[in-house]
Amino acid sequence: MAAKELSHLQQLEAESIQIIREVAAEFDNPVMMYSIGKDSSVMLHLARKAFYPGKIPFPLLHVDTDWKFKEMIAFRDEQAKEFGFELLVHKNPEGLEMGISPFEHGSAKHTDIMKTQGLKQALNKYGFDAAFGGARRDEEKSRAKERVYSFRDKHHTWDPKNQRPELWRTYNGAVNKGESIRVFPLSNWTELDIWQYIYQENIQLVPLYFAQKRPVVERDGMMIMVDDDRMPLAEGEQPKEELVRFRTLGCYPLTGAMHSEADTLEKIIEEMLLTRSSERQGRLIDSDQSASMELKKRQGYF
């Protein structure tokens, strides 16, 4: 009897699970980055599948900037409790002491101190030699040219001109002490693949991905949700209740909402089939300077 041909999503799933298992077997101290978004939720689901019925054999790490949506933090804690994985949370103590804020210090400085430097602090603190990330090649041009196994030197920096060849899904994970590999098991997935897989597997998500009335203000052509009382309002500026959802999630002052009526997975998938814009257009950190994402990745950002 001929072997059953795998569907497109089954092929992607099998590839990702193979990568996750290979890293767990090859490296001494791996970690999975957990940003609480849809890609992280899919990656967590794949890791649970990869080692079922056992537990995930490595911790999950959330680098908390102290400016995430409240619903994201609540969802993170609920997931850790429900699935019983080890959750590490790191906040840059120097950044907290300095009172770093995206409003007062700008997106570039906030991202560098609270995310990039915070991430490097956590990786050094725990001595991780491999870190899973949920980035996909279709998201952004600098990520499109990055390998599945992305080598980082002892300073956690990335050199796009010095990447290792990956032939026939053969990955080179050799590192010296202090060096590490960033691993992207979702590299070959698209945003639509992610949503179709979430629907197929019934994966839980932060409610922010679904349309509902939310208080927003318009700034620089983007709708920013007023998530807490730390957000300064200009004179005469009043939040308006708009029917919106988020395609991508990050720090709430730096993440734009979109008008949408998609309040179910089916409606979101239908919306994705019609859209012609990138999900990253809703992230201010991708446009705060020229070649923004590649520069951040060279400095140690995921």
Swiss-Prot record:
Q: Where are the transmembrane segments?
A: none
Q: Which EC number(s) does the record attach to this protein?
A: 2.7.7.4
Catalyses: sulfate + ATP + H(+) = adenosine 5'-phosphosulfate + diphosphate
Q: Which UniProt keywords apply?
A: ATP-binding, Nucleotide-binding, Nucleotidyltransferase, Transferase
Named in its record, the pathway it takes part in is: Sulfur metabolism; hydrogen sulfide biosynthesis; sulfite from sulfate: step 1/3
Cited InterPro entries:
PAPS_reduct_dom, Rossmann-like_a/b/a_fold, SO4_adenylTrfase_ssu, Sulfate_adenylyltrnsfr_sub2
Its BP terms in the Gene Ontology are:
hydrogen sulfide biosynthetic process; sulfate assimilation
Q: Which family does it belong to?
A: Belongs to the PAPS reductase family. CysD subfamily.
The entry's protein name is Sulfate adenylyltransferase subunit 2
In the UniProt record, what gene is named as encoding this protein? Answer: cysD
